[in-house]
């Protein structure tokens, strides 16, 4: 069965109830929340989904410079913790998967001083750590290929697929 949903981030700071009401009126059956475990209230999300007969099948991960899965340092650790916290949020709202962009959205040039191999290895290790936690909770992680105007890293389906194969994880 197919589900028709909309990702919430495209409406910006619109009130959740306004978005949910519009989705129901337009015949949608789902909503994709931004993976914002620190800003969204899971209980409010549940109430709105129930009120407007919606389901949440996925969360859209938000990855910036401070959440960089290609980083071996603090930004990489922060990204892993963010994904773990997002997994907990996904469980609360009934989402089955989280969309993951391995590098910061908006960084279109590879960081100086690192090879693509080093950055890829960092991403693989960080995503595996988050995937271990996701698997325990029954949540899948999905690598999203975004275009070259938004990232230097996994910016084609071929590159994203190669990363998935290298991660080699059930989650």
Q: Across the structure, where does each feature detected by a protein language model lie?
A:
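N-terminal pre-domain/capping segments
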Residues: 1-95, 117, 128, 169
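Active-site acidic/histidine proton-transfer and metal-coordination neighborhood
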Residues: 74-171
